[in-house]
Amino acid sequence: MLGKISLLLLPVFVAINLVHSSPEIIKNLSQNFCKAMDQCKQELNIPDSVIADLYNFWKDDYVMTDRLAGCAINCMATKLDVVDPDGNLHHGNAKEFAMKHGADASMAQQLVDIIHGCEKSAPPNDDKCMKTIDVAMCFKKEIHKLNWVPDMDVVLGEVLAEV
C-alpha cells in the first residue's frame, strides 16, 4: 500500500521540484545569455541606460521600450547562435542552449515553444530591434505566468560579483 502511495505521489514531488528549480534555471539562462553583453556593448556603443533596462527586464511591472535594448538582445542572441540571420529563433540551437544551462529536454522545448509563440503573436515590424523588444516582453509575460521568474537580487548580486 505504501509503495502504491509513493508511486502516486512521485509525479507530484517531481512537479514541485520542477517549479522550485525553474526560476534557478531561468536565472542561469539569463546570466549565460548576458555573457555576450560586453562584446555587444562595445559593438553597438550601448549606453548604461540600456544596461539598466536589461537588468530590470524581469521585474513584473517593467516595460522595456528603448530600441537599443532590443538591438542588444538581438546582438547577444546572434553571438550565442540562438537566432538565424533574420533574427528568428533557431529552435535547435535555442533548445541546446537551454539544456546546456540547466533545463531538461521538456523545459527547454517549452521555452522554445514560448519564444516561437511570441514571435508569431508579435505585431509585424521591419525594425528587428523593436520586433525583438515585442518578443522579449511577451516571453517575460509568459515566464511570469509560469512563476519561473528568477530572484533579481540574486541575479544582480552574482552579476556584480563577476565584474
From Swiss-Prot:
Disulfide bond annotation, renumbered to this chain: C40-C75, C71-C129, C118-C138
Keyword Nucleotide-binding annotated: no
GO BP annotations, alphabetical order: response to pheromone
SUPFAM superfamilies per record: Insect pheromone/odorant-binding proteins
Keyword set, alphabetical order: Disulfide bond, Pheromone response, Pheromone-binding, Signal, Transport
Signal peptide annotation: 1-21
Family matches, as CDD domains: PBP_GOBP
Tissue specificity note: Antenna.
Molecular function GO labels: pheromone binding
Pfam families reported in the protein's UniProt record: PBP_GOBP
Family, similarity comment: Belongs to the PBP/GOBP family.
Role description: This major soluble protein in olfactory sensilla of male moths might serve to solubilize the extremely hydrophobic pheromone molecules and to transport pheromone through the aqueous lymph to receptors located on olfactory cilia.
Protein name: Pheromone-binding protein 1
The species this protein was found in: Antheraea pernyi (Chinese oak silk moth)
